Amino acid sequence: LANSININTPKMIGIIEHQYQVKNLLDIVKGYDTFVIKPAHGSGGKGVLVIKEYDAEHFYSASGDVLSFKDVYQHVSNTLSGLFSLGGKYDVALIEEAVNFSDVFKDFSYHGVPDVRVIVYKGFPAMVMMRLATKESGGRANLHQGAVGVGLDVRTGQPLNAVMHNKTILQHPDTKANLMDLRVPFWKEHLIIGSLAYDMTGLGYLGADIVLDKNRGPMMLEVNARPGLAIQIAHGRGSKNRL
């Protein structure tokens, strides 16, 4: 759907739908040094595993973990069983190419890929935040797991407020960068992608997650039908007056 309306997205390498297909993982990722395994119906960033490289014995995750083949196969199996899905329902495992993320945010994010979440109401960007990975979050840009959320002005992209664990902060806990110095290149393009997500899905209220690839520019990672309330905490104010 995204490709049909010219929205950049990571390439889908493969899909594992059944337990008997788990053993085919290595064949699916052949030719890819780095990739991402994620549940199709996950929430809160649960179940997302970013593999940076692998050899004949181990997989190496973006968070620095060394995983055996058995560990990763079990992770995929758990995904299919619904361990990470909403309501614990049976799920499928999506395998995508990893984003070659831009280094413009290297001072603001610890290891993992930072992303921009655009809340879109009836096709119009209403609130925006950037989520920055930390050591505590394991390199994941997820506020529930300890990432930093920075509320951004929709019109300018300038930082307005920053939080971690629902508390206001000024510096990134690991890099010590001043979060008010954060700037997002291609700001207009981020907002356009968010608006196009409405055209693609028809959802009156959604959250579009967008990352900045070094070579391809802004790319949409996913669209959330229930994006949650964390963005209001990142802004330090509610969304009622914006909808």
Identify the residue ranges that each predicted region occupies.
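Short acidic-glycine loop/turn motifs at beta-strand connectors
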Residues: 52-56, 120-124, 154-156, 213-216
